[in-house]
């Protein structure tokens, strides 16, 4: 089979057309409590088991890091016939390695998951990778936004700035007010989905149409940030 494409393209890739398979699955070793979201992806791709014949899947922290490998999201993935080694800078690095494993995995004629032998070293070139939803056109639905966040995770993006101009609680006339119950629940859903995909959900405020440059409105802005904090938002 041809080598699969990896998106986005990693910094360094050396892959063989030879493939490894683990008919008895993999057993975890190394890090005691790897990231739950990353492990969910890994379990979707590989069979994780306590079988004594399973091959090792070892997760460790990167050592002797270059400056690039100290960046959030950096990882080193080594696949040999006997094991898989993943060395990571942080939980985001493990999540990105898991996304790469999903793209590399194929199924053979016997139903076994196979992976190409090789080494992948990857790290981000830029600290903030993502989008601003701030346009004035047709608004995205809540489902659209959830799907966008999942796409960002797959593409190893880490920033989503929420600022749709059809949202009157982000902009005028209601930016000073709390979100109603339904919309507040949707914000919570977006924050949760963003976190599961290692995306920073950034809530933007757009008060320019009617803000008064007074101490009162300064406090209104801070109070609104407090309301959003209570909904789970941590970036503004």
Residue map of PLM features:
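Acidic, contiguous N-terminal accessory segments
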Residues: 1-92, 100, 104-121
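Feature activates predominantly on carbohydrate-active enzymes
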Residues: 71-72, 78-235
């Amino acid at each position: 089979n041809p080598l699969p494409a990896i998106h986005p393209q990693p910094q360094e890739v050396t892959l063989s057309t030879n493939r490894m398979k683990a008919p008895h699955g993999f057993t975890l070793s190394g890090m005691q409590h790897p990231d739950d979201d990353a492990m969910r992806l890994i379990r979707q791709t590989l069979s994780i088991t306590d079988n004594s014949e399973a091959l090792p899947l070892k997760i460790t922290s990167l050592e002797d890091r270059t400056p690039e490998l100290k960046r959030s999201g950096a990882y080193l993935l080594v696949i040999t016939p006997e094991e898989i080694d993943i060395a990571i800078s942080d939980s985001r690095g493990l999540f990105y390695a898991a996304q790469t494993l999903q793209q590399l995995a194929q199924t053979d004629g016997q139903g076994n998951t196979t992976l190409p032998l090789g080494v992948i070293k990857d790290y981000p070139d830029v600290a903030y990778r993502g989008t601003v939803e701030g346009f004035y056109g047709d608004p995205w639905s809540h489902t659209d936004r959830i799907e966008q966040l999942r796409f960002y995770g797959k593409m190893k993006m880490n920033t989503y700035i929420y600022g749709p101009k059809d949202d009157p609680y982000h902009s005028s006339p209601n930016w000073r007010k709390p979100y109603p119950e339904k919309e507040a629940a949707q914000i919570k859903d977006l924050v949760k989905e963003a976190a599961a995909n290692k995306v920073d959900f950034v809530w933007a405020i757009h008060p320019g149409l009617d803000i008064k440059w007074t101490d009162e409105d300064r406090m209104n802005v801070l109070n609104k940030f407090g309301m959003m904090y209570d909904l789970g938002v941590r970036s503004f």
